Amino acid sequence: MQNQRIRIRLKGFDHRLIDQSTAEIVETAKRTGAQVRGPIPLPTRKERYTVLISPHVNKDARDQYEIRTHKRLVDIVEPTEKTVDALMRLDLAAGVDVQISLG
């Protein structure tokens, strides 16, 4: 797997779970002899929703909710066969979305 790169993008609502998952990925990759670049924090997406509290009158009475989507990027440069096998067997938290691309 010469001149290869594995790019791993992690997304989730809880930044502690994402940081824990990136630490596991980095530790696994370094243990198998690959170079790691990252974790790189990407911009957090903030979605805001405003909801009327009152069903009829009192237009000024509103609640505001926010969902933050945190993202991290990890590049694994020159991965070995052991690195790929270890990453496939890695168990990550349930609240983390992982996207892996080869390049």
From Swiss-Prot:
Domain of life: Bacteria
PROSITE patterns registered for this protein in UniProt: RIBOSOMAL_S10 (PS00361)
Biological process according to GO: translation
SMART domains: Ribosomal_S10
GO cellular component terms attached to this protein's record: ribonucleoprotein complex; ribosome
InterPro entries registered for this protein in UniProt: Ribosomal_uS10, Ribosomal_uS10_CS, Ribosomal_uS10_dom, Ribosomal_uS10_dom_sf
Keywords in alphabetical order: Ribonucleoprotein, Ribosomal protein
Molecular function via GO: structural constituent of ribosome; tRNA binding
Membership in a protein family: Belongs to the universal ribosomal protein uS10 family.
Subunit structure: Part of the 30S ribosomal subunit.
Function: Involved in the binding of tRNA to the ribosomes.
UniProt protein name: Small ribosomal subunit protein uS10
Gene this protein is translated from: rpsJ
